[in-house]
From Swiss-Prot:
Taxonomic lineage: Archaea, Methanobacteriati, Methanobacteriota, Stenosarchaea group, Methanomicrobia
The organism of origin for this protein: Methanosarcina acetivorans (strain ATCC 35395 / DSM 2834 / JCM 12185 / C2A)
GO BP: regulation of DNA-templated transcription; transcription initiation at RNA polymerase II promoter
GO molecular function: DNA binding
Name this polypeptide is given: Transcription factor E
Keyword field: DNA-binding, Transcription, Transcription regulation
Database matches in InterPro entries: TF_E_archaea, TFE, TFIIE/TFIIEa_HTH, TFIIE_asu, TFIIEa/SarR/Rpc3_HTH_dom, WH-like_DNA-bd_sf, WH_DNA-bd_sf
Subunit structure: Monomer. Interaction with RNA polymerase subunits RpoF and RpoE is necessary for Tfe stimulatory transcription activity. Able to interact with Tbp and RNA polymerase in the absence of DNA promoter. Interacts both with the preinitiation and elongation complexes.
Gene3D superfamilies assigned to the protein according to its UniProt record, in alphabetical order: Winged helix-like DNA-binding domain superfamily/Winged helix DNA-binding domain (1.10.10.10)
Positions of the HTH TFE/IIEalpha-type domain: 8-90
Function: Transcription factor that plays a role in the activation of archaeal genes transcribed by RNA polymerase. Facilitates transcription initiation by enhancing TATA-box recognition by TATA-box-binding protein (Tbp), and transcription factor B (Tfb) and RNA polymerase recruitment. Not absolutely required for transcription in vitro, but particularly important in cases where Tbp or Tfb function is not optimal. It dynamically alters the nucleic acid-binding properties of RNA polymerases by stabilizing the initiation complex and destabilizing elongation complexes.
Length: 167
């Protein structure tokens, strides 16, 4: 396999599992060297052909798989030859980290700048404005809404943002 990456690294493993799942990771680990067809990958790895194709497509979308088409001169059929290239994985992980950090900061700002009310039965969590529209009654079950102190959640978000910012 043409990876140029340590698949035992827990961050890289976790990222690949989030992209292609456990079966996809198994396919990556057992994929033959060089250019191979999806059928050859399925035969060598024991992963179902549909899973192999789905995994290859996801890897291709994320620029971790390279595909070359070859036309059979006799039948006219196209054959797709695949190989993997994880040389850009560090850059991809940095982009994912920045996106996650941006989303966490947006959520933190939302949580800090709003007041929430919840149904004691767990039906809904509403913004103050939404709670006033329902006269502080749960729109699902009719229970009185109660103030929700989100300070623990805000604190957890801040810790997560700080941890990601320092890496």
């Amino acid at each position: 396999m043409n990876t140029l990456v340590d698949l035992n690294d827990k961050v890289i493993r976790g990222y690949l599992i989030s992209l292609v799942g456990e079966e996809g990771l198994r396919m990556i680990e057992e994929m033959p060297e060089g250019e191979v067809t999806d059928e050859e990958i399925a035969a060598k790895t024991g992963v179902l052909l549909n899973t192999v194709r789905r995994t290859l497509f996801i890897l291709y979308e994320n620029k971790f798989a390279i595909c070359r088409r070859e036309r059979d001169s006799n039948s006219g059929w196209l054959t797709y030859l695949w190989h993997l290239d994880f040389s850009d994985v560090e850059h991809q992980l940095m982009r994912e980290k920045k996106k996650l950090l941006r989303n966490l900061k947006t959520r933190l700002e939302f949580e800090e700048n709003n007041v929430f009310y919840v149904c004691p039965q767990g039906c809904v969590r509403l913004l103050f404005d939404e709670a006033t529209e329902t006269e502080f009654l749960c729109p699902m079950c009719g229970e009185d809404l109660v103030y929700y102190d989100n300070s623990r959640f805000v604190s957890a978000l801040k810790k997560r943002v700080d941890a990601l910012s320092s890496v």
